[in-house]
């Protein structure tokens, strides 16, 4: 897989070791960053989408990319990458937040997933590692029908969700308990009903590093529970189940100074971002180290050949 940087905030282009090691294609979209950060009107999103289409050229299933997008404030740009794909695929999302809020009049970084679920090429969505804003008051904005129909399969990080409609839905956390790391046996147990389907279609992965705990990611949001080994365990399992057919991937969750354009985005920033002080150099070093390990894992050893799955995982 090739690596590209969609540079909206300068967070990735500041990571010299990533640039030197992987020599990604860099697309300078810094001018767009303040105008789409956190949210944007659909008209603006379509203009940016056309710009990406011109820059990237035609989509080729045999030429898949790992796209680095910078801050999680730009996670809604994943939708533009998904809309470029023409063949059916399953979507794996690893994220602390649901990102599926309904009813918003604009495209928001916390709402893109419910739009992705409507794309005809997206067959099933697996949302893993979530913890925050699932069963609080925002549950009323969740795409309940899609979740109940298993169009979106939800596997929280460490706990069951216990308010509202979640009480009636079967869902189990990735960890058996708070202190037991995720392993292949646990993933097999949780995902066994979907293994044949995963085997039939290619996979797209969208990773927000806010699902990871603080020592391994410093984001513009709050941090999650998973460590890097667990994230790699999850990706390795899904890749193996999909026959290593990875149609594309994007990574968000780097930290950057927040620069927004317009009163509404400034309001969103104050309303939604946690107010904690972050040392910019520390954030860059931390996220660069994690990005390097993720990219090495994906490019050099995406699936450990020594791992053998039960025979039913290999059935067509």
Residue ranges and their predicted role:
Residues 76, 107-111, 120:
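Residues forming well-ordered secondary-structure scaffolds
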Residues 1-69, 73-90, 121-124, 133-134, ...:
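Catalytic cores of soluble, metal-dependent hydrolases
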Residues 99-105, 125-128, 177-181:
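Flexible, glycine/proline-enriched loop segments at strand-loop-helix junctions
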Residues 147-153:
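Short, conserved active-site loop motifs that form the nucleotide-linked donor/cofactor pocket
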Residues 94, 128, 252:
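Conserved residues at the C-terminal ends of beta-strands
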Residues 113-127:
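Glycine-rich phosphate-binding loop plus the immediately following alpha-helix
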Residues 91-104, 108-115:
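Long, hydrophobic, well-ordered secondary-structure blocks that form the structural core
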Residues 139-143:
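Distinct, well-ordered alpha-helical segments
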């Amino acid at each position: 897989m090739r690596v590209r940087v969609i540079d909206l905030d300068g967070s990735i282009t500041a990571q010299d070791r990533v640039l030197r090691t992987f020599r990604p294609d860099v697309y300078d979209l810094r001018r767009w960053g303040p105008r789409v950060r956190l949210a944007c009107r659909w008209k603006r999103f379509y203009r940016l989408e056309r710009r990406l289409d011109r820059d990237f050229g035609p989509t080729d299933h045999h030429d898949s990319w790992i796209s680095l997008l910078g801050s999680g404030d730009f996670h809604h740009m994943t939708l533009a990458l998904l809309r470029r794909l023409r063949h059916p695929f399953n979507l794996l999302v690893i994220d602390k937040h649901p990102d599926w809020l309904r009813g918003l009049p604009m495209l928001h970084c916390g709402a893109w997933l419910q739009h992705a679920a409507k794309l005809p090429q997206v067959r099933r969505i697996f949302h893993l590692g979530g913890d925050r804003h699932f069963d609080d008051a925002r549950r009323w904005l969740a795409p309940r029908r899609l979740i109940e129909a298993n169009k979106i399969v939800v596997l929280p990080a460490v706990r069951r969700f216990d308010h509202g409609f979640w009480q009636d839905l079967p869902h189990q956390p990735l960890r058996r308990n708070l202190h037991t790391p995720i392993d292949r046996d646990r993933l097999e147990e949780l995902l066994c009903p979907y293994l044949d389907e995963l085997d039939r279609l290619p996979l797209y992965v969208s990773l927000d590093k806010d699902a990871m705990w603080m020592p391994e990611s410093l984001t513009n949001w709050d941090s999650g529970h998973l460590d890097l080994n667990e994230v790699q365990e999850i990706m390795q399992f899904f890749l193996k189940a999909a026959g290593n057919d990875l149609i594309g991937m994007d990574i968000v969750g780097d930290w950057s100074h927040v620069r927004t354009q317009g009163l509404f985005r400034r309001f969103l920033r104050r309303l939604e971002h946690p107010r904690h002080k972050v040392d910019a150099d520390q954030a860059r070093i931390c996220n660069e180290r994690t990005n390097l390990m993720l990219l090495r894992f994906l490019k050099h050893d995406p699936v450990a050949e020594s791992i053998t799955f039960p025979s039913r995982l290999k059935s067509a």
